[in-house]
Amino acid sequence: GLITGAADDDPSGIATYSQVGAAFGYGILWTAIVTFPLMIGIQIVSARIGRVTGDGIAANIRKHYSPWLLYGLIVLLLVANTINIAADIGAMGAALKLLIGGPAHWYAIAFGAASLILQVFVPFPRYSPILKALTLALFAYVGTVFVVRIPWGHVLYETFIPSMSFNVHYAIGVVAVFGTTISPYLFFWQASQEVEQQRAKKGEEPLTEAPQQARRSLRRIQIDTWVGMALSNMVAFFIMLTAAATLHMHGITDIQTSAQAAQALRPLAGEFAFLLFSAGIVGCGLLAVPVLAGSAAYAVAETFQWKIGLGRQLMKARGFYTILSVATLLGVALNFTPTDPIKALFW
């Protein structure tokens, strides 16, 4: 739940939240209130599917529905995840360029390679604490709010009694927020991580076979999911708020990337806000890319009944790691084409 929630605030999500905050100001903040219970509900269901059945979402769809439905969903997930990986890696490269200078494309290659090496060659029990530590990067966006001037009374009013704009651009912005917040790859990742955790713990079985374990397991899932989704939504709210209080209030309403948002903050909110925002992009990207690539690999491997798991060695789950590697490498490669991954995700 914690890693899932933190991965939801990836660099492409940061770009979307910055875009809508800059474009619509405080009038978009209400979306964080609406998405919160929706996120909790769907992520708890996803986790329960994994814990109860001992299989991920793709494996359960394969058992109960038409294979063509499954194949269609998996193709869409693969395409979306690959574009998302491209957007995140590109954003990380651009953010690091802002921080230290140098070529953004080379940084993108380095981030992609580092992420891939970590996933393929480092055992997941040793890798998981690194992912959890990277969730601390989200607090950069909490800190950013407190170094800019915020009219809190007006913010609270607009959050709960928003002044909405009934036009196409506003509707697209709302859909973009919902789409980046409630993302399918998180469903697959959450369910598959429950399966991984259950298989790794001695004595734990799927709840269909060990119903006596249900009370403890379902309570853990509920607490974990509430904490993760609360953190995710709080950060999304603060990113939109930062963009609204700085960029929108100074007439900057057209933001295309998270790095552009960080750069625009510099003269308006100061060097510290800029550094926090930029560093957050890098940290959140390092967390999100493994989740995106991993969820794609879980989905495809479960579909074709291959051996799965980040806890397995490379040669014991070759199909799984092949999909993970291809998704990551294609994501890196897309940054060297005319395609704009951020724009593709938004639309």
Q: Which residue stretches match the model-derived regions?
A:
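Juxtamembrane transmembrane-helix boundary signature
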Residues: 3-4, 31-64, 73-83
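Flexible loop linkers connecting adjacent transmembrane helices
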Residues: 16-19, 44-69, 94-96, 201-204, ...
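Transmembrane-helix boundary/entry motifs in multi-pass membrane transporters
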Residues: 25, 52-79, 98-104, 226, ...
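Extracellular/periplasmic helix-exit of transmembrane alpha-helices
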Residues: 38-52, 192-200, 212, 230-260
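Hydrophobic transmembrane alpha-helices that form the core helical bundles
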Residues: 48, 52-53, 70-101, 108-113, ...
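Loop-to-transmembrane helix boundary motifs in multi-pass membrane proteins
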Residues: 67-70, 105-109, 272, 276, ...
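Transmembrane alpha-helical segments of multi-pass small-molecule transport proteins
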Residues: 74-75, 99-121, 137-142, 146, ...
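Hydrophobic alpha-helical segments and their helix-loop junctions in multi-pass secondary transporters
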Residues: 136-163, 180-196
